[in-house]
């Protein structure tokens, strides 16, 4: 038991020490080339972590700082995956203020810092969800698609409708009435071609096929 506790202690100690920024021995007089480019943007105070990648070789780290809170994220491949817990604490502390992000890169055993960039945190929360159609790039695999919703405070995604339930046909052109998630319409093509109207728990289908169109909606 003592050995187990000692190992746990070492793991915790290592986690704390690895979260500290390294000593900086030089400055790079330019902003880091990051993707996506979040430089100078304003974000809602409940947005999911803004993970990003930096175009540089070797070890890198990013130091996130606001009044009252700071943490460091390390990356061996230049891609930063920001921990949810640290990010949420940062946004709470930075509400109505800004976050400074310093990217450091290691060269020959010494760390150099790019010029910092900033993200402003709004006092307004983000809308809970965004809805979208998900389909493979280029539309080659159009027979595998669906309409999904993602929680914007996280990366949780769940289907509203997947076309595997409708004979793998095309589903498109969805919209909501005045941003009301309880009032929605979308179009279905091919075998079950129609417009689907959703009003709370009431669902209605409309056949818009005419003699002058090749199918419903077209």
Report residues per predicted region:
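Sec-dependent N-terminal signal peptides
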Residues: 4-13
């Amino acid at each position: 038991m003592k050995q187990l506790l000692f190992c746990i202690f070492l793991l915790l100690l290592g986690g704390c020490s690895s979260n500290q920024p390294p000593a900086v021995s030089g400055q790079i007089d330019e902003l880091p080339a990051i993707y996506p480019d979040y430089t100078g943007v304003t974000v809602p105070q409940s947005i999911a972590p803004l993970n990003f990648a930096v175009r540089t070789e070797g070890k890198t780290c990013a130091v996130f700082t606001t009044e009252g809170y700071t943490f460091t994220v390390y990356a061996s491949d230049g891609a930063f995956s920001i921990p949810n817990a640290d990010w949420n604490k940062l946004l709470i502390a930075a509400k109505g203020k800004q976050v400074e992000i310093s990217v450091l890169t290691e060269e020959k055993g010494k760390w150099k810092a790019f010029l910092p960039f900033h993200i402003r945190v709004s006092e307004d929360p983000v809308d809970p969800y965004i809805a979208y159609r998900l389909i493979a790039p280029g539309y080659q695999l159009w027979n595998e698609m669906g309409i999904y919703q993602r929680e914007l405070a996280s990366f949780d995604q769940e289907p509203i409708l997947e076309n595997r339930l409708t004979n793998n046909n095309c589903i498109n052109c969805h919209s909501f009435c005045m941003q009301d998630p309880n009032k929605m319409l979308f179009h279905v093509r091919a075998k079950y071609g129609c417009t689907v109207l959703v009003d709370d728990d009431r669902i209605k289908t409309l056949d818009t096929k005419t003699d002058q169109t090749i199918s419903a909606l077209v």
